[in-house]
Design a protein with these regions (language model features):
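FIC/Doc superfamily catalytic core
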Residues: 1-253
């Protein structure tokens, strides 16, 4: 229904804002700090509840209701663990950065510091850590799809590290996620680039009077393009912007 679509759209927008804010913080400070993580979660969840202060949080099997894992309950303990994680994230060591990312992700999800949004916050931390280590220039590697597709393995392996110290299988899972997501991302970027060229050619040939590279960029930056976007970027009147959009619609764009 419309309400659920609206809520999903808000979640996506919040995720985008949180990721870009994190990217800005890491780019400016060359650090990924506890206070940055708290700010990212606040943007994701649109509240300032912050780190868990009340006991009672458990991770349960969705089908049976069985408690699978009980994260740290004490506020001071959570703070201390996050401080330790902050040190590990930012201090150099001899471990490969991708393996470090797997370790950091497991530790963060095990601390489970927030009432809500731990999974999404953890996945943003993954991206920001790779940027911090110069493995990414911009935040374009989204592991969420792989993790959600392989959710059962994700939770099983998280727990097996806690109960059986099975780090190797967990690390291999994360490395596979990075590899598969990287290949899919390259394919997606190439597809977008090809489509952009096709749209550019179509507009320049069929609507040469309104064509500009800025116009094409607007269409790809904003899948739902509004009059205001054209007015601001192209410095044209609302009437002209409306005319442009109608002409684009008439040629099937």
């Amino acid at each position: 229904d419309i309400e659920s679509i609206t809520n999903e759209a808000k979640e996506v927008q919040n995720y985008k804002e949180a990721l870009l804010r994190g990217f800005s913080l890491v780019s400016d400070t060359k650090l990924l700090l506890k206070k940055h993580i708290i700010e990212i979660q606040e943007i994701l969840e649109q509240n300032d509840a912050g780190i868990r202060k009340q006991a009672g949080t458990n991770l349960k099997n969705a089908q049976t209701g069985e408690v699978i894992y009980t994260p740290p309950q004490d506020y001071e303990t959570i703070q201390e663990l996050l401080t330790n994680l902050e040190i590990y994230i930012n201090e150099p060591n001899d471990i490969d950065s991708l393996i470090n990312m797997a370790i950091i992700h497991h530790q963060f999800e095990s601390i489970h510091p927030f009432y809500d949004g731990n999974g999404r916050t953890g996945r943003i931390i993954n991206i920001l850590y790779l940027i911090l280590k110069d493995l990414l220039d911009i935040p374009v590697l989204y592991l969420s799809r792989y993790i959600i597709t392989h959710k059962a393995d994700y939770y099983r392996l998280l727990q097996e590290v806690r109960t059986e110290d099975k780090w190797e299988e967990w690390i291999l899972y994360i490395l596979e996620a990075v590899e598969q997501t990287s290949l899919e991302t390259i394919e997606l970027i190439n597809s977008i680039s090809d489509l952009m060229i096709k749209i550019q050619d179509k507009i320049s040939q069929e609507l040469p009077k309104i064509y500009s590279k800025d116009l094409v960029e607007i269409l790809f930056m904003h899948p739902y393009t509004k009059i205001d976007f054209l007015v601001d970027r192209l410095n044209i009147t609302r009437k002209t912007a409306s005319k442009y959009l109608n002409e684009l619609e008439n040629i099937g764009i």
